[in-house]
């Protein structure tokens, strides 16, 4: 199966209490694509600078990621630097240099427009809208956003919500978008702003809660899933996009897209995020084997067996 993904590619400088690195390959496209590539062929659309080396393109191709949709522009690749303390929920952004990403205005290649699964990474909601309008009735559209866009591009974001099937955000962003402190009420409000899917099913909101797992809401039901507990966590960068990669990747292989398959997909998303945080940047996702994913899924599944 094929997945179209649109978002950022970056060079990250990361510092945690346990690991650090400079110019680490990152961005939403990198984490999403590496995670999803274990399930499907990935067709990313993004922009990089002249400092993006042939070895980086080679890495993508090695992992079932088609690099033909990546534009190489004059200038430097988007770069970001962040620091974490022992509470990984508190992150300090040292700098953000958009560079070539500042002028990113994606035009989908003709062959990409009919790809049935679309992931919209964290970016300007107007760009997300433009991308949706270029596609030819995809089977599933999943989007991410953040507090910056909720605050500055609210109208555009609300229009985007009416075109997507699933929104993935964290609890603070849920409250901010809904303008409601109670998380349950906030989730219900956001789902009510979304239109029924092209399949006639309920729109879905997934709320990421880090070490506390996630909540999934449809118009009728809700579902809670814990995180996969790890002894060692070294770097949470990209975990949300790795979750999305596992989630969409699993769904791309399913005959039926419904609440049951969505729930199982959240388990695979959680598994991919758990691998991501075990090493600096995307290192673990790069070396990960399908066998390891299935072994961890079986362990995770046992948590829900009645004793």
Feature-to-residue mapping (PLM):
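Conserved N-terminal subdomain of the carbohydrate kinase-like
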Residues: 11-23, 38-119, 133-138, 294-307
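Extreme N-terminal starter segment of soluble prokaryotic enzymes
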Residues: 1-4
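Short, conserved phosphate/pyrophosphate- and ester-handling motifs at nucleotide-, phospho-/glycolipid
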Residues: 36, 170, 240
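Histidine-anchored nucleotide/phosphate-binding helix
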Residues: 27-37, 132
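A short acidic, amphipathic alpha-helical/loop segment
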Residues: 55-56, 127-134, 155-159
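Short beta-strand scaffold segments in enzyme catalytic cores
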Residues: 34, 80-83, 213-217
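Conserved phosphate/ATP/ADP-binding segment of small-molecule kinases
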Residues: 137-140, 147-224
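Conserved post-catalytic alpha-helical subdomain immediately downstream of the catalytic base
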Residues: 43, 228-299, 303
């Amino acid at each position: 199966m094929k997945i179209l993904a649109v978002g950022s590619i970056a060079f990250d400088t990361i510092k945690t209490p346990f690991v650090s690195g400079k110019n680490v390959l990152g961005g939403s496209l990198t984490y999403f694509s590496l995670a999803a590539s274990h399930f499907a062929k990935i067709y990313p659309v993004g922009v990089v600078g002249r400092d993006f080396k042939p070895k980086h393109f080679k890495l993508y191709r090695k992992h079932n990621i088609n690099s033909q949709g990546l534009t190489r522009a004059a200038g430097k690749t988007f770069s970001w630097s962040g620091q974490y303390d022992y509470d990984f929920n508190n992150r300090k952004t040292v700098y953000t240099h958009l560079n070539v990403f500042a002028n990113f205005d994606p035009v989908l290649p003709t062959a990409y427009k009919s790809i049935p699964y679309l992931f919209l990474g964290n970016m300007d909601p107007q760009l997300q809208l433009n991308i949706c309008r270029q596609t030819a009735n995809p089977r599933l559209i999943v989007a991410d956003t953040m507090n910056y866009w909720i605050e500055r591009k609210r109208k555009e974001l609300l229009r985007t919500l009416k075109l997507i099937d699933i929104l993935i955000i964290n609890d603070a962003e849920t409250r901010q978008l809904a303008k409601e402190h109670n998380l349950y009420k906030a989730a219900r409000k956001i789902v009510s702003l979304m239109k029924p899917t092209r399949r006639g099913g309920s729109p879905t909101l997934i709320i990421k809660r880090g070490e506390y797992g996630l909540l999934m809401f449809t118009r009728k039901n809700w579902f809670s899933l814990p995180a996969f507990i790890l002894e060692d966590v070294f770097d949470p960068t990209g975990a949300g996009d790795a979750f999305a990669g596992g989630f969409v990747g699993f769904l791309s292989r399913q005959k039926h897209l419904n609440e049951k398959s969505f729930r199982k997909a959240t388990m695979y998303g959680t598994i991919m995020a758990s691998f991501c945080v075990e090493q600096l940047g995307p290192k673990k996702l790069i070396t990960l084997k399908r066998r390891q994913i299935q072994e961890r899924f079986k362990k995770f599944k046992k948590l829900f067996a009645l004793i």
